[in-house]
Design a protein with these regions (language model features):
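Ribonuclease/tRNase effector modules and their secretory precursors
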Residues: 1-76
Protein backbone atom coordinates (compact mmCIF):
# COMPACT_ATOMS: atom_id res chain seq x y z
CA UNK A 1 0.00 0.00 0.00
CA UNK A 2 1.37 3.48 -0.81
CA UNK A 3 2.66 5.43 2.20
CA UNK A 4 0.92 8.64 1.14
CA UNK A 5 -2.57 9.47 2.30
CA UNK A 6 -5.18 9.26 -0.49
CA UNK A 7 -8.82 10.29 -0.73
CA UNK A 8 -11.54 10.36 -3.37
CA UNK A 9 -15.27 10.68 -3.87
CA UNK A 10 -16.79 7.18 -3.68
CA UNK A 11 -19.51 7.89 -6.27
CA UNK A 12 -16.87 9.06 -8.74
CA UNK A 13 -14.79 5.99 -7.89
CA UNK A 14 -17.69 3.68 -8.78
CA UNK A 15 -18.33 5.60 -12.02
CA UNK A 16 -14.64 5.35 -12.93
CA UNK A 17 -14.61 1.62 -12.22
CA UNK A 18 -17.63 1.13 -14.47
CA UNK A 19 -16.31 3.35 -17.29
CA UNK A 20 -12.59 2.50 -17.23
CA UNK A 21 -12.34 -0.80 -15.34
CA UNK A 22 -10.03 0.63 -12.67
CA UNK A 23 -10.87 1.78 -9.16
CA UNK A 24 -9.23 4.72 -7.42
CA UNK A 25 -7.98 2.23 -4.84
CA UNK A 26 -6.08 0.48 -7.62
CA UNK A 27 -5.04 3.80 -9.20
CA UNK A 28 -3.11 4.87 -6.11
CA UNK A 29 -0.53 2.17 -6.89
CA UNK A 30 0.48 4.10 -10.04
CA UNK A 31 2.39 6.40 -7.66
CA UNK A 32 4.64 3.45 -6.68
CA UNK A 33 5.83 2.76 -10.23
CA UNK A 34 9.51 3.80 -10.28
CA UNK A 35 9.05 4.83 -13.94
CA UNK A 36 5.90 6.88 -13.28
CA UNK A 37 5.49 10.25 -14.94
CA UNK A 38 3.97 13.23 -13.13
CA UNK A 39 2.75 16.07 -15.35
CA UNK A 40 0.87 19.30 -14.72
CA UNK A 41 -2.79 19.28 -15.84
CA UNK A 42 -2.95 22.81 -17.24
CA UNK A 43 -6.43 22.38 -18.70
CA UNK A 44 -8.01 21.66 -15.29
CA UNK A 45 -5.85 23.85 -13.02
CA UNK A 46 -7.75 27.15 -13.10
CA UNK A 47 -9.18 26.79 -9.55
CA UNK A 48 -6.46 24.59 -8.01
CA UNK A 49 -3.26 22.95 -9.22
CA UNK A 50 -4.01 19.56 -10.72
CA UNK A 51 -1.67 16.87 -11.96
CA UNK A 52 -1.50 13.59 -13.89
CA UNK A 53 0.33 10.52 -12.65
CA UNK A 54 0.95 7.87 -15.31
CA UNK A 55 2.21 4.59 -13.96
CA UNK A 56 2.08 0.84 -14.45
CA UNK A 57 -0.19 -1.20 -12.18
CA UNK A 58 -0.44 -4.97 -12.65
CA UNK A 59 0.66 -4.73 -16.27
CA UNK A 60 -1.65 -1.83 -17.19
CA UNK A 61 -0.72 1.82 -17.65
CA UNK A 62 -3.04 3.99 -15.56
CA UNK A 63 -3.45 7.75 -15.86
CA UNK A 64 -4.55 9.29 -12.57
CA UNK A 65 -5.73 12.90 -12.20
CA UNK A 66 -5.03 14.31 -8.75
CA UNK A 67 -4.31 17.33 -6.57
CA UNK A 68 -2.74 17.88 -3.16
CA UNK A 69 -5.12 19.01 -0.41
CA UNK A 70 -3.88 19.50 3.15
CA UNK A 71 -1.12 16.91 2.76
CA UNK A 72 -3.41 14.35 1.12
CA UNK A 73 -3.48 13.22 -2.51
CA UNK A 74 -7.04 13.68 -3.81
CA UNK A 75 -7.79 11.47 -6.84
CA UNK A 76 -10.41 12.61 -9.36
Amino acid sequence: MPQHSFEWDEEKNLANLKEHGASFGEAQFAFLDPRRIIAHDEKHSSREERWFCMGKVEGRILTVRFTYRHGTIRIF
